[in-house]
Amino acid sequence: MTDPAQNILDIRQILGLLPHRYPFLLVDRVTEYVPGEYIKGYKNVTMNEPFFEGHFPGVPVMPGVLIMEALAQAGGILVVKSTDTPVEDKLFLFTGIESVRFRKPVYPGDKLELHCRLLRHKLKLWKMEGFAYVDGKLAAEAVMTAAVTNREDM
């Protein structure tokens, strides 16, 4: 087995795996992954994020739903790297989110670390737990379920 730390993906590689684009691409780099097991990556949160203009003026805080979306995107990369399915033909859609907890606000300048671990996979459904950290402290956590579907079925 290869060293998980050798499984690094830069932004160009991530763009080849996810359909998301600015301003909705929320994973900047993958620092390690093991297909079928887990993934770690991060999002550099900057004041240039468009959502900070309205959330909240004078006290910018990253919306919790976007933290969840960042975790879901990291999880989507894990799913892609865990299958042989051509990514161009597929979409990964949230089907459920459980046990969501927001523990710490995320501010401009934070490096949002994204950790997802696969819990189970059956047919088109993938269930994983996700944890978001800032400076080693838990900012948010959730259990997420996603379905893999054909683009043409949408």
Curated annotation (Swiss-Prot):
Task: Return the GO cellular component terms, semicolon-separated.
Answer: cytoplasm; membrane
CDD domains associated with the record: FabZ
Q: Which domain of life is it from?
A: Bacteria
Q: Where along the chain is the active site annotated? A: 55
Location relative to the cell? Cytoplasm
- Extract one GO molecular function annotation from the record: (3R)-hydroxyacyl-[acyl-carrier-protein] dehydratase activity
- Which reaction(s) does the protein catalyse, per the Swiss-Prot or TrEMBL entry? a (3R)-hydroxyacyl-[ACP] = a (2E)-enoyl-[ACP] + H2O
Q: Does the keyword Glycoprotein apply?
A: no
> What are the record keywords, sorted?
Cytoplasm, Lipid A biosynthesis, Lipid biosynthesis, Lipid metabolism, Lyase
Query: NCBIfam families attached here?
Result: fabZ (TIGR01750), PRK00006.1 (NF000582)
Q: Record's PANTHER family?
A: 3-HYDROXYACYL-[ACYL-CARRIER-PROTEIN] DEHYDRATASE
Annotated family:
Belongs to the thioester dehydratase family. FabZ subfamily.
Query: What's the protein here called?
Result: 3-hydroxyacyl-[acyl-carrier-protein] dehydratase FabZ
Q: Say which species the protein is native to.
A: Nitratidesulfovibrio vulgaris (strain DSM 19637 / Miyazaki F)
**Primary gene name:** fabZ
